[in-house]
Amino acid sequence: MARFYRRRKFCRFTAENVAYIDYKDIDTLKQYITENGKIVPSRITGTKARYQRQLALAIKQARYLSLIPYTDNHK
């Protein structure tokens, strides 16, 4: 039987000693949004709760200011 080993999740913001997640950093924010525009949960990304709250707030601010779209797949 083969066992599947998952890579350990870690918080990227803690590793890089980020003090505050900026809503103007679009490249970072897009890594935490699905292709449908939803915010990826921390249980999948491994982000700590403190940074997940900052991340959600930054994404919502960027959406409001039209820096990133609410949804990507308009047809």
UniProtKB/Swiss-Prot annotation:
Keywords: Ribonucleoprotein, Ribosomal protein, RNA-binding, rRNA-binding
Any Gene Ontology CC annotation: cytosolic small ribosomal subunit
Species whose genome carries this gene: Acinetobacter baumannii (strain AB0057)
Listed GO biological process terms: translation
Its biological purpose: Binds as a heterodimer with protein bS6 to the central domain of the 16S rRNA, where it helps stabilize the platform of the 30S subunit.
PANTHER family recorded: 30S RIBOSOMAL PROTEIN S18 (PTHR13479), SMALL RIBOSOMAL SUBUNIT PROTEIN BS18M (PTHR13479:SF40)
Any Pfam family the entry gives: Ribosomal_S18
Keyword Ribonucleoprotein: yes
Protein origin, superkingdom: Bacteria
Family listed: Belongs to the bacterial ribosomal protein bS18 family.
Protein name per the record: Small ribosomal subunit protein bS18
InterPro entries per record: Ribosomal_bS18, Ribosomal_bS18_CS, Ribosomal_bS18_sf
Quaternary context: Part of the 30S ribosomal subunit. Forms a tight heterodimer with protein bS6.
Alphabetized GO MF terms: small ribosomal subunit rRNA binding; structural constituent of ribosome
